[in-house]
């Protein structure tokens, strides 16, 4: 059965003559896309931690080999797997693109700086490249229906802010980010980019200016800046604080993962949060 697929990726025209059997992916969102059509990559840049991958994504994948971190995947580990396709992130892996091409054909797609709509486009491209175009279209249709279901259970137009909190830094995820655009697609009112920054680092005063009805926080560290802000008198001026509408969410699911399953988990989480139900702990 002759297979040839040609798509436009971030580098230009990309063609494969035969269906890839040994795929290595260098971002978590690409693993999510493959899981959506039950194709298992042999290698994933999973930051040496399989738990970075959502449980519902892991359920669709056979065991894989870690090829190191997303920021600096190991070229040796990738080469050792003898892949016939590498899927890389156009922002993170531009510097190693040439080196990766020495190992196998490289499909270069947006991941790190993508929006929700771009992520779904990437998933469609990946589906086509692995010979599962029909299956991916069906999964994307199902995805749209599921997302509409969850959207219908949320109060339309509610102002919601999601951000990640480290020791010294809070980053607001605006409409231009993946998570922000997922929340916006659910009919929620998400802050716009600030001074051209899609993920600005903001202080408590700036958060007060945004003043969301709901504040959703992924704490990257135990001692996170938001926990300190909560001791500040200004904190009580936040609508979300007054209404007790501040919730903690899982950082892997909400900030690192990205993808079809990840968006569905975020939508399900958001419905639970807005209805004051406990979230399932991600194992």
Describe the residue ranges of each PLM region.
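Boundary at the C-terminal end of the N-terminal hydrophobic targeting segment
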Residues: 2-4
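A short, structured surface patch at a secondary-structure boundary
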Residues: 22, 28-77
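Extracytoplasmic ligand-binding site segments that recognize negatively charged/polar headgroups
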Residues: 95, 109-125, 159-180, 222-226
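Structured C-terminal subdomain patch of bacterial secreted/periplasmic proteins
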Residues: 214-283
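Proline-aspartate-enriched helix->loop->beta-strand connector
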Residues: 75-77, 82-88, 105, 207, ...
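Basic- and aromatic-lined ligand-binding clefts that recognize polyanionic substrates
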Residues: 22-34, 135-189, 193
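Short secondary-structure boundary segments
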Residues: 27, 90, 218-222
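Short helix-initiation/N-cap motifs at beta->coil->alpha
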Residues: 9-11, 67-76, 195-204
């Amino acid at each position: 059965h002759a297979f040839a697929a040609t798509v436009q990726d971030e580098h230009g025209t990309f063609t494969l003559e035969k269906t890839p059997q040994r795929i290595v992916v260098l971002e978590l969102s690409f693993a999510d896309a493959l899981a959506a059509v039950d194709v298992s990559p042999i290698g994933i840049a999973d930051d040496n931690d399989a738990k970075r991958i959502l449980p519902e994504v892991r359920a669709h994948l056979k065991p894989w080999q870690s090829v190191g971190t997303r920021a600096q995947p190991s070229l040796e580990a990738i080469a050792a797997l003898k892949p016939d396709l590498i899927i890389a992130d156009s922002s993170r892996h531009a510097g190693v693109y040439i080196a990766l091409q020495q190992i196998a054909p490289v499909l270069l797609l947006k991941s790190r700086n993508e929006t929700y709509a771009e992520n779904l486009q990437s998933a469609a491209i990946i589906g086509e490249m692995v010979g599962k175009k029909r299956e991916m279209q069906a999964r994307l249709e199902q995805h749209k229906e599921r997302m509409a279901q969850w959207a219908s259970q949320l109060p339309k137009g509610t102002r919601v802010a999601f951000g990640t909190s480290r020791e010294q830094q809070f980053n607001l995820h605006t409409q231009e980010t993946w998570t922000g655009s997922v929340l916006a697609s659910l009919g929620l009112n998400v802050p716009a980019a600030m001074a051209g920054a899609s993920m600005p680092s903001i202080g408590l005063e700036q958060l007060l200016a945004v003043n969301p009805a709901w504040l959703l926080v992924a704490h990257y560290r135990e001692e996170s800046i938001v926990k300190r802000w909560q001791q500040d008198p200004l904190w009580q001026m936040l609508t979300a604080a007054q209404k007790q509408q501040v919730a903690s969410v899982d950082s892997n699911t909400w900030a690192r993962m990205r993808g079809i399953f990840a968006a569905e988990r975020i939508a399900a989480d958001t419905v639970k949060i807005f209805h004051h139900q406990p979230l399932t702990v991600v194992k």
